Amino acid sequence: MRLLPLGLFDKVKLGGTPMATNPNRWRTIDIVIASIIAVAFGVIFWAWGLLWNGPADAIPLPGRAVLYGMWLVPAVLGALIVRKPGAAFYTLTLASLVSVAIGTSWGWTLVVQGPLEALGAEVVFAAFAYKRYNLPTALLAGTAAGIVAAVYDAVVWYPETSWTSMRLPYIAITAVSALVIAGLGSVLLVRALAQTGVLDRFAAGRSRALV
């Protein structure tokens, strides 16, 4: 008896009628790669927090916000690689939870802030119906996540400070940092990874001309 190829029933219906594959459905490899990115950046977040509260403490606020974009990279990076609804939200939220588990100085507040920042990026990709994964979209997603993060900080962490001398400049600097580090940085990282071939199972890897 001849065995049918593995996965055949995922592609055909009874009678041989082709069944369309849902492009928005997450594959196992999507979950795995998004989780790997999240765990890796959860550790990076912890180290970045040491930098923020250590050597970088010499840079007064709002200037120190130039470093903020690193905390938003997983949202843009995860979305650019996985290219599925929820990728930005899943990757950054999980990265935030990992950093909480490791022992970040901001503790459980990140359980709320992480998903909010992730939603900022997710909304941008959703606005383009999850079909645009180019440089402008990545820059917008990074900036949106940065604005959400900075507004949260301004309201929760710095409520007593002046809007003109502290909070508005802080929001602006954070947005620019997110645009450059999370937006442009993620694009460059995906390009570098694609050239190695490690992303060949993803659209981001098969299209060498990504973004």
Regions found by a protein language model. Name each.
Residues 53-61, 129-133, 195-198:
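Membrane interface segments of multi-pass transport proteins and intramembrane proteases
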Residues 34-38, 112-157, 187:
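Short helix-perturbing small/polar motifs within transmembrane alpha-helices
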Residues 127-131, 180-197:
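Membrane-water interface at the C-terminal end of transmembrane alpha helices
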Residues 62-121:
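Alpha-helical membrane segments and adjacent membrane-interface helices in multi-pass membrane proteins
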Residues 43-67, 100-111, 150-173:
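Membrane interfacial helix motifs at helix-loop boundaries and amphipathic/re-entrant anchors
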Residues 193-211:
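Short, highly charged, low-complexity non-transmembrane loops/tails of multi-pass membrane proteins
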Residues 6, 16, 20-78:
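Hydrophobic transmembrane alpha-helices
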Residues 31-36, 69, 73, 85-93, ...:
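Hydrophobic alpha-helical transmembrane segments
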